[in-house]
């Protein structure tokens, strides 16, 4: 009888020990929370950081799994503005401000990219944007990049009434073909596309930067323009679990941006396939624009956003009217993304 009791006690102890020992393993096996984000389809620069986060495992480092969905710019903006996509990694201030005026239920958490764009040309004699007058310029006019480019071109003395603007959402090779065939005179694109086009042109193409630091410092008193931001639906960020996800994603963003600045060659190798850009061309962009990525809470720059949305963009015709103070406060989130995540 004694032996039977001892065996039963041993069995109970063993079962309890196994349960305790297996608990950490079971906990470790629990799936990570997923964060699904929309980006512009490649070769948009909005795919760089999410792709690097995935390739370098920075999402898992910060305790979540990132899912990236590339979409054409018009689809991405429509889905974000209507709430179909609650998370957008391609929310250009100049573009989504229009949606805010129309009652859009979203807010912007942090800046991702400063404004930069390039004008790619065949004619070597064109070395000043004013020489675009009388020419055909192709670009994607639905994007915030175009809205800011338009403001800079006008500020630099270009009469856009004398420039024929051809709008197209075609990216990469399609736009380059139009330029090489002589159907257009110039192509206004992001820095990645600009570098790729110049590289593929093998000496036949050159690029002019649109951003002018002196012009901007005179207008704003700062050295950069917040441009592409991380936007979320208000209902989404109101949920505690999503607040934690947003903070984890912000930390991963900061890590990715630091990696790109410190290791542009390796970053280009990791991201080029997703970005659909030649490794060498992408490396050139990352080295040329080391300060292009500026991951900071947008609320820190609300005065600059106010200047953009309440003065410069409306005066330039890129917004139908200035944002009201209430719209501005709603547009630029005061959610603390830098607080420690759980």
Language-model segments: residues:
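N-terminal secretory signal peptides that target proteins for export/translocation
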Residues: 1-6
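Bacterial N-terminal signal peptides
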Residues: 10-21
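Short, solvent-exposed loop/beta-turn-alpha elements that line the ligand-binding surface or hinge
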Residues: 61, 134, 211-223, 291-300
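Pocket-lining segment of extracytoplasmic ligand-binding domains
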Residues: 94, 174-177, 181-271
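Conserved C-terminal helix/tail region of periplasmic/extracytoplasmic solute-binding proteins
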Residues: 310-342
